[in-house]
Amino acid sequence: INNRLHTKFVAIDNRTVYLGGSNIGDYYTTWSDSNLRVDGELGNIFHNIYDFLHGFSHDGNFACRLLDISNLQAGTDRLWLTVPRHQYHIREALMNLINLADKSIYIRTWYFLPDEEMLNALCAQAQNGVQVNVLLSHVTRVRLVDFANHIHVHKLVNAGGNVYRYAGKYMHSKASWNDHGDVLFGSANLDAHSMHINFESCLEIHDSNLTWELRRAFYADLSTSPKQTPESYSNRSFANKALTHVCNLASPWL
């Protein structure tokens, strides 16, 4: 369960990398997911990360000599990692993206269980007039998460955020961006496992053209994604609400 290898990438010939949220298997072909192709020096960096992962032993030790994980940068693009018990830079990068926004924040995520500090940052931005938009999968493969996230969604909606639940089969994308063209794209969900426990990788890019494409895809999915309202929470059954509160207590471990 812990120290899970959750990063997803394909590195080709030391010059091309595909990264994002997609798993490999026939079962996943019907899921809505997002992946990014990057050419250049980052392809070589991901080859080095692949070698680095061979240093991961069964007891969770890393042979850090295989890779300098403190400087994973190509031009203005920066690769951030969550390395269990070592680095939590993806969370720091996401907090910066949220706090630096002036007009809008967009988040696509499979799981939406932000910790208290991150949820408060999103709520504060919404209350300050920043358009906070979150698209999450209404149903995941972990039903406890599906119940627990209702409280997080309810708090953000009450603060003025826009939250949508993807009603297709599964929405597995993981991407965040703001109005400055800052993008964080990769394998990490908004939950404790991705921020602290799994091995994850996310690419930080500054690209207004990419944010335009991501925003276009975001709004295209809203046709099948009901917007959440205060009534979406209050109109649920007593049993559903009770289960939500019980599951929320376990959210730091989900």
Model-assigned labels for residue ranges:
Residues 1-254:
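Charged, low-complexity intrinsically disordered terminal segments
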